[in-house]
Structures are given as structure tokens and as C-alpha cells.
Amino acid sequence: MKKMLVVLLFSALLLNGCGSGESKANTAETPEVLDVKLTGPEKVNPGESAAYEAAVSYGDEAVTDADEVEFEVWKEGEKDASQMFKVKQEKGVYRLETTFKEDGVYTVQSHVTAKKQHSMPTLKVQVGDADAASNQSEEEHSHHH
């Protein structure tokens, strides 16, 4: 009987030890996600300078050391002729200043790679008399690895 009691007591302690380790795994923090907020004017006049900013954060902290940040700009229907711009950052904000030469609906897209993640939010821009309401907006594309 003593042996049975010792075995049961040992088993209970062993199971209790395994159980406490499991609860720690369940309370582990969820991994942070790369967040990119793309902002800038959605209506501009041809020849007018416009600034677009990608504020990059990871959790609550600004990302000042992204692996790569570029802006891509193209006129609707002409993505094959898009232009890529490398930009510099200040306090986690990456900025593009550009000028649209002619009327039309354009897309400004930031490509951000940081913390082994990639995010590509887009913003539609109506230049001059172009009718942005008749055009479909593109979805934000984000890839997390």
C-alpha cells in the first residue's frame, strides 16, 4: 500500500509540474505585427507638390531601421510604367515628396520590409479633374512571415 501511495504522490507532483509549464505557454505574448500607416492628400492639382508619409511601427515602437522602404507610384491602368522611389526616414516616418504632371487617378503604394515582415498599403490620389469615384479602390496588401 505504501508503494502505491508513493507512486500516486510522485505522479501527482509530476503532472502538476507539467501543468504549470503549460500555463506559461498559454500566457505568452502574441507576436508583434508590423504596422504601416500611409497618409497624404487624396486630391491634388497637376504640377502641385504632394507629400506622402509611411509611419512604420512594430508594437508600440517606431521602426527607424527598416530593411527597405520604397514608394511606388502609378497612374491607373499603367502599373507596368510605375515609378519606384527610395526614401529616408525620421523617427519612424518615411516621406515621399512628388509631383503629378497630369490629370488622372494615381496609386501611391509604400513597400516596407522590417522585422522579417512586409507591408504594402496603398492610397488612391485624384489629380485634377479625374473622377476617383468611378474607380475601384485597391485593397491593402500585407505579408507576415
UniProtKB/Swiss-Prot annotation:
<protein>
    <recommendedName>
        <fullName>Uncharacterized protein YtkA</fullName>
    </recommendedName>
</protein>
<dbReference type="Pfam" id="PF13115">
    <property type="entry name" value="YtkA"/>
</dbReference>
<dbReference type="InterPro" id="IPR032693">
    <property type="entry name" value="YtkA-like_dom"/>
</dbReference>
<feature type="region of interest" description="Disordered">
    <location>
        <begin position="116"/>
        <end position="145"/>
    </location>
</feature>
